[in-house]
Amino acid sequence: MLYKGDTLYLDWLEDGIAELVFDAPGSVNKLDTATVASLGQALEVLEKQHDLKGLLLRSNKAAFIVGADITEFLSLFLVPEEQLSQWLHFANSVFNRLEDLPVPTLAAVNGYALGGGCECVLATDYRLATPDLRIGLPETKLGIMPGFGGSVRLPRMLGADSALEIIAAGKDVGAEHALKIGLVDGVVKQEKLIEGAIAVLRQAITGDLDWRAKRQPKLEPLKLSKIEAAMSFTIAKGMVAQTAGKHYPAPMTAVKTIEAAARFGREEALNLENKSFVPLAHTNEARALVGIFLNDQYVKGKAKKLTKDIETPKQAAVLGAGIMGGGIAYQSAWKGVPVIMKDINDKSLNLGMTEAAKLLNKQLERGKIDGLKLAGVISTIHPTLDYAGFDRVDVVVEAVVENPKVKKAVLAETEQKVRPETVLASNTSTIPIGELASALERPENFCGMHFFNPVHRMPLVEIIRGEKSSDETIAKVVAWASKMGKTPIVVNDCPGFFVNRVLFPYFAGFSQLLRDGADFRKVDKVMEKQFGWPMGPAYLLDVVGIDTAHHAQAVMAAGFPQRMQKEYRDAIDALFDASRFGQKNGLGFWRYKEDSKGKPKKEEDAAVDDLLASVSQTKRDFSDDEIIARMMIPMINEVVRCLEEGIIASPAEADMALVYGLGFPPFHGGAFRWLDTQGSAKYLDMAQQYQHLGPLYEVPEGLRNKARHNEPYYPPVEPARPVGSLKTA
């Protein structure tokens, strides 16, 4: 053994070939600060071996290196810019030493090589991969850019266009594509990986492969003519401006850095990467996006812990076909859980099966599946008008009309047709689970399971724990949701649960703005372009359905009369009374026509202004800041109340539910991350200016306490250790 660290070791393999093996404790390798330091120490040993002929890098895990240790990011990003820059210089000196070894080097890459893992293998001369490879640089999705030389080496290896596509979009690619673009040099089966790697190294050692020529382009300026450079970078900047926009600075910074570094060799180019990375790491966007990643890990870990002793349901059923039922059935079948889809008429069943078939055909068109797989999946969805097969079902989700009487009747009937241990769930969006449970003999086997539309795209499923829901019931439904590829978040019961409970105060803020003379078009524009929502409130209401929102608004008002009962006729009432139900019938706040792809495209409709005139005062202009404040304060206050009342268990779960269920702008990180970034005291000062607008604008006492004591909702993060100590393992 030449060197043994906590996460890697170095040893002789054969004939002057050494192997550096990443083998961290636990299930995966991460390129954390300790591993970078350990790699430097291993290279120091290696540099003294005069009989060294070649170096093989490999992993003892199912994945090569999954990336940097993102749990370290928030503390690293808190160190002063100069110290962070120094540490990056140190880390890059380690990878430069790997790249500068006087012998050929090869990385045998299995599974994932992402972020720092990818940057590590870019420093080797050759890369051999297994068919399950996923390799790429996802840093821009975290609000930063590659910092270990990825933005320098990748363009010089692949050419500007392919590298820009991967770096700016934060993409990873599979083995076949990586081979095509030159990111790896060969693909071999896992059992042949080491044998193949040694064979390539031997060819390089004997001179049959010119490893020096392979290495040289990574050390030089990017080989692009002025015209080629202008075309590549102009196109890339245009694409990034269109897709990322102003709220996500990292992709544009990465493109501009690669452009600026193109005319320099490795050392100068790395200095430019360093100068661009450090300011990005100190942005609110980076903290928010890293926070989302960590919250996602927390939520998934919580679900895994909850279901560790639970067997995933093997047979499911959906009550109520149609678009929603068909979407749920598709998702379950697609992920391997057969499903019975029951309805009371053939028309609805046909609609549900058509929806499932449409979604599968899209997978076929994209090349994700073949005809055989499509037929196999669709055959596991069994449409029926009766309860045949329900005695074999492990879990049933009811997705009928949003009417408590109908839902109670359907659930009570179904309870008599299933085994005593079968779990029943309701896909209600607003009706309290306790109310629906009153119709059941076994309420402990019942809970809520709120999917979001469209089911196949929306990652969140709200799991609602009723007063009598058992832990086993919750665990079974969480297990099914996880199996479906969804992110389940458990909340406690109340009208609207968590997501809709906080959404309708936001809509109420919108209605009050229109009542006071705001133009809905400007409100939409400000909330989309300035705050960053994917849709403004008017557009969102049209997509949800004005009729659906009108009904839900009444349910929420009955549940929370003190705050959500309104004493005036609002825009939603006016549109509902005029049968303008939104996208579903082509008329809402906007008029909708199908585009060439059959998707609804919104257009202005002057007729809506006459309708809204009856429920609004004389038009007046509002500043962007006032619109944002009046829209967001009711939502933020309600989110805080939900945490204080125990409806949602933690700021992390609340923020993930908002991002995954409502599209809360990820660069803000969620409501609690946004609050912490603003500071509770600053938020309180802003909110107090609008308290005269009613109870929805009254700040909860818990938040006032946070403001008084200057306390954040997330635990404070301590800066990383001094840079000098990070240079040792």
UniProtKB/Swiss-Prot annotation:
Residue sites binding substrate per the record: D296, N500, Y660
Site positions per UniProt: Important for catalytic activity: E119, E139
Disordered as annotated region, ranges: 708-729
Known EC number: 4.2.1.17, 5.1.2.3, 5.3.3.8, 1.1.1.35
Keyword Ribonucleoprotein on entry: no
One BP term from GO: fatty acid beta-oxidation
Record pathway: Lipid metabolism; fatty acid beta-oxidation
Reactions mediated catalytically: a (3S)-3-hydroxyacyl-CoA + NAD(+) = a 3-oxoacyl-CoA + NADH + H(+); a (3S)-3-hydroxyacyl-CoA = a (2E)-enoyl-CoA + H2O; a 4-saturated-(3S)-3-hydroxyacyl-CoA = a (3E)-enoyl-CoA + H2O; (3S)-3-hydroxybutanoyl-CoA = (3R)-3-hydroxybutanoyl-CoA
Gene Ontology MF term list: 3-hydroxybutyryl-CoA epimerase activity; delta(3)-delta(2)-enoyl-CoA isomerase activity; enoyl-CoA hydratase activity; long-chain-3-hydroxyacyl-CoA dehydrogenase activity; NAD+ binding
InterPro entries: 3-OHacyl-CoA_DH_CS, 3-OHacyl-CoA_DH_NAD-bd, 3HC_DH_C, 6-PGluconate_DH-like_C_sf, ClpP/crotonase-like_dom_sf, Enoyl-CoA_hyd/isom_CS, Enoyl-CoA_hydra/iso, FA_oxidation_alpha_subunit
GO cellular component: fatty acid beta-oxidation multienzyme complex
A Pfam family hit: ECH_1
Annotated residues for binding of NAD(+): M324, D343, V400, V401, E402, K407, S429, N453
UniProt keywords, alphabetically: Fatty acid metabolism, Isomerase, Lipid degradation, Lipid metabolism, Lyase, Multifunctional enzyme, NAD, Oxidoreductase
Active site: H450 (for 3-hydroxyacyl-coa dehydrogenase activity)
Superkingdom per UniProt: Bacteria
3-hydroxyacyl-CoA dehydrogenase as annotated region, ranges: 311-729
Region of interest (Enoyl-CoA hydratase/isomerase), residue spans: 1-189
HAMAP family reported in the protein's UniProt record: FadB
Family named by the database record: In the N-terminal section; belongs to the enoyl-CoA hydratase/isomerase family. In the C-terminal section; belongs to the 3-hydroxyacyl-CoA dehydrogenase family.
Biological function: Involved in the aerobic and anaerobic degradation of long-chain fatty acids via beta-oxidation cycle. Catalyzes the formation of 3-oxoacyl-CoA from enoyl-CoA via L-3-hydroxyacyl-CoA. It can also use D-3-hydroxyacyl-CoA and cis-3-enoyl-CoA as substrate.
Subunit structure: Heterotetramer of two alpha chains (FadB) and two beta chains (FadA).
Protein known as: Fatty acid oxidation complex subunit alpha
Organism: Salmonella gallinarum (strain 287/91 / NCTC 13346)
Gene: fadB
